[in-house]
């Protein structure tokens, strides 16, 4: 995926699209496996909905951290300790 400061080119966008397609295929296989194991579709839909909400919140948080980092003249990762964030999350 494109990182801060990385130049956006058609090649990097195509690479990101391919990675996302591969991730979608992997997730579709996992869903099929869970259904085969007896999980109900409604449970999976609720779980997926919660994951989307989590990812949206995380995306907004990263954007805000980025803006704060620019304001303070530091990198985003340098802000992680200030907010007790794990850099591996």
Curated annotation (Swiss-Prot):
Coiled coil segments of this chain: 7-37
Compartments in which it is found = Nucleus
Q: Which GO terms describe its cellular component?
A: nucleus; Swi5-Sfr1 complex
Query: GO:BP terms for this protein?
Result: cellular response to ionizing radiation; double-strand break repair via homologous recombination
Q: Which domain of life is it from?
A: Eukaryota
**What keywords are annotated for this sequence in UniProt?**
Coiled coil, DNA damage, DNA repair, Nucleus
Q: How does it assemble?
A: Component of the SWI5-SFR1 complex. Interacts with RAD51.
Q: What's this protein's family per the entry?
A: Belongs to the SWI5/SAE3 family.
- Function summary: Component of the SWI5-SFR1 complex, a complex required for double-strand break repair via homologous recombination.
Give the protein's recorded name.
Answer: DNA repair protein SWI5 homolog
| UniProt source species | Rattus norvegicus (Rat)
Provide the gene name from the record: Swi5
């Amino acid at each position: 995926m494109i990182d801060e400061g990385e130049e956006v080119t058609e090649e990097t966008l195509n690479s990101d699209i391919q990675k996302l397609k591969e991730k979608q295929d992997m997730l579709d296989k996992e869903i099929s496996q869970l259904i085969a194991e007896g999980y109900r579709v409604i449970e999976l839909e609720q779980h997926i909905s919660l994951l989307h909400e989590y990812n949206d919140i995380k995306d907004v948080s990263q954007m805000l951290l980025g803006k704060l980092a620019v304001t303070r003249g530091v990198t985003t990762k340098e802000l992680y300790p200030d907010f007790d964030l794990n850099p591996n999350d």
